[in-house]
Amino acid sequence: MKKIALVSAIALASITAAHAAPTVYGKVLLTGEYTDVDDKTATNKDTSTTQLVSNSSRIGFKGEDDLTDTTKLVYQLEYGIDVDAASNQDSKGKDKNQFYSRNTYIGLAHNTMGTLLAGRHDTPFKLAKGGVDVFNDYDNVGLGNLMVGETRANNVIAYRSPTLVGVPVTFMAAAVLSEEDKDADVANTDIDEGANGYSASLAYDQNGVYLAAGYDNNIRSSKTDSAWRLAGSVDMGKINMVPGFTLGALYQETDVADKSEDEKSWLVSGKYKIGATPWAVKAQYIDTSNRSGVKDNDATEVALGAEYTINKATKGHLYAAQIDTDNVSDKTIVGGGLEYKF
């Protein structure tokens, strides 16, 4: 079905009609990655692997169509692509889920009242991080590997406000419909299977300063009863301090379903564009306590990276990370590759 949906989207993009044609966009970020794992579990099975990683490569189609002088229809069909291999293969080696839905929706946008979307979408809680995670581009390094809550949910109805009353503040809220009988409830768990989930965020963004707060409630796919996060970043050049340097931070607490401990995480990051050169360097540290709600299950990640801008569409990447998880493993990752956007 996903392949059929993608073929339909491509056919739509090729049709010449009176309505505005959709914008076709995408990116490929393919890296070679070496991973060395020091196993701390009872099996004590250390591993070393080398692989290609597709790193959220995607293709998308988006557009809008005026319905009235003040309202337009908006849509987006975005699909992740595993450039190096299929996401999964069956017993005969045939590709399964080569294309998978990312943010895919249809909605209405009003000039002054905001935008209403329905489909599959990142939760407002997830989006509240902004650009704080400077290793967000990579599948195996970054915030999503040490914190819960990075959810792209199905059955989402979301509202995004315009800028509020001349102030650079936006509000976003979403309901995640459960798909279950409203009376459904699995015994001996804290998750209310029949209840909808909710997510909201409030963000300030002006002159290089970004501040945001996000909240999740009963988001089943991330197994959270509730979670909140605060995020912020400052472009030091735009406040007349250090040109080219951006500093970011995030703090998050999560009440994990059916666990006695709250997961607590924090992150600090920095990225520096080196003068008139094509180089940028970046660094990030993440610390998580009681990971996944398990007492004293702590984890840290230290990551370093560099980017080399070849032209407007093409960029080279180098990165390395050390991820240590108590009683599980110590993992070293080194990678590099190319990114192309269109």
Spans of features found by a protein language model:
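Outer-membrane beta-barrel proteins
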Residues: 1-342
